[in-house]
Amino acid sequence: MAWSRLMLAACLLVMPSNVMADCLSLCSLCAVRIQDGPRPINPLICSLECQDLVPPSEEWETCRGFSSFLTLTVSGLRGKDDLEDEVALEEGISAHAKLLEPVLKELEKSRLLTSVPEEKFRGLSSSFGNGKESELAGADRMNDEAAQGRTVHFNEEDLRKQAKRYGGFLRKYPKRSSEMARDEDGGQDGDQVGHEDLYKRYGGFLRRIRPKLKWDNQKRYGGFLRRQFKVVTRSQENPNTYSEDLDV
């Protein structure tokens, strides 16, 4: 018995490490799974039979059948998981498609509109009758007239507001027709036109300017006393009045 154990240990040492590890793991898994069954297996003997060091027996056959069943169940479970994942993906895709369906329809419509050639649109425009074109032209004219009326009304209101603001100054202020006349005449009669412009501009102020007064105190008083108080100088008095006073 001791010699058999020593030989088993020597065989285990001589075996490749990866094969030994695979066989040991498989046999240990089988032993753990079947230990509560009617025929438990020895993992050491199972691993030797797995590595072809010992002739195969019932233990290795049992473990191999269990391993094949285990692989089938694992693959079946994986297949079910894959099917469930595929179903979930399909459901998610269908839900997204339902949500994006109106957006996709609008995009298709826009693509169709852009893909239609310009000649078709020209044909559609030519399908309108002359009556419709005349109606459109009449409507445009009415809009233009209404816009012009609004501008005229607006200008009149502005003028009224300005007249109220400046107290009639704009009505009294003359137009500068003299500048236009100068441009037309080429600069001729410039003094006369300028005098008329000044005369209209100052509103009769130039008419109140009087000529020089010829009396004695004109240089001294500048005509102020004569205009305001009607003062009569001695040079204008009658000298006979003084002689009569002296005679009396």
From Swiss-Prot:
Cellular component aspect of the GO annotation: extracellular region; synapse
Propeptide residues per the UniProt entry: 22-163, 177-199
Post-translational modification: The N-terminal domain contains 6 conserved cysteines thought to be involved in disulfide bonding and/or processing.
The keyword Secreted belongs to this UniProt entry's keyword annotation: yes
Keywords on record: Cleavage on pair of basic residues, Disulfide bond, Endorphin, Neuropeptide, Neurotransmitter, Opioid peptide, Secreted, Signal
Ranges annotated as biased composition (Basic and acidic residues): 176-185
Region spans: Disordered: 175-195
Secretion signal span: 1-21
Protein name: Proenkephalin-B
Gene source species: Mus musculus (Mouse)
